[in-house]
């Protein structure tokens, strides 16, 4: 049975446990704390404190997410969409994508090798046979 999050100490402890596993965005962390029974009146001040102390960082979360998803073969369009769905500001997402050290052309080649065994289609009509490839944002036709 999980503990009730009815005190600032309990909320902070749970938030730090979640952050110890991986970086979280503020919106995501708020959602997880709410799911565990914490109220917004107690969540917000604790998240503000964690951010002031440098323990909760949107910039680190963006960097970590971009690195992870690009490493899984996703392109900037898909990553941008996923981060937007997670409640992050469009300007922050764009800045993080610009500042990321991801070589998108190299990632695209890696994904191409993995999905098509390095074979180049003879024409553009061959690409729709793998629509999932273009949806990842890694397609050379986009």
Curated annotation (Swiss-Prot):
Q: Which domain of life is it from?
A: Bacteria
Which coarse location class applies to the principal site listed for this UniProt protein? cytoplasm
Record localization: Cytoplasm
Instruction: Please tell me whether the keyword Cytoplasm is annotated for this protein.
Output: yes
What are its GO cellular component terms?
cytoplasm
Per the UniProt entry, what are the Gene Ontology biological process annotations, in alphabetical order? regulation of DNA repair
Q: Which cysteines are joined by disulfide bonds?
A: none
Alphabetical keyword list: Cytoplasm
Region annotation Disordered: where it falls in the sequence: 118-142
DNA repair: present as a keyword of the record? no
InterPro entries (UniProt xref): RecX_HTH_1st, RecX_HTH_2nd, Regulatory_RecX, WH-like_DNA-bd_sf
Q: What does this protein do?
A: Modulates RecA activity.
Family of this protein:
Belongs to the RecX family.
Name it: Regulatory protein RecX
Q: Which gene encodes it?
A: recX
């Amino acid at each position: 049975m999980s503990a009730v999050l009815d005190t600032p100490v309990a909320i902070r402890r749970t938030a730090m446990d979640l952050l110890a596993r991986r970086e979280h965005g503020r919106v995501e962390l708020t959602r997880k704390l709410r799911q565990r029974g914490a109220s917004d009146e107690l969540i917000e001040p604790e998240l503000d404190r964690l951010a002031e102390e440098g323990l909760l960082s949107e910039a680190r979360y963006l960097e970590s997410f971009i690195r992870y998803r690009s490493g899984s073969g996703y392109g900037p369009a898909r990553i941008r969409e996923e981060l937007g769905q997670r409640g992050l500001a469009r300007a922050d997402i764009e800045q993080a994508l610009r500042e990321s050290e991801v070589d998108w052309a190299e990632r695209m080649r890696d994904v191409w090798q993995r999905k098509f065994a390095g074979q180049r289609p003879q024409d553009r009509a061959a690409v729709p046979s793998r629509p999932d490839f273009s949806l990842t944002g890694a397609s050379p036709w986009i």
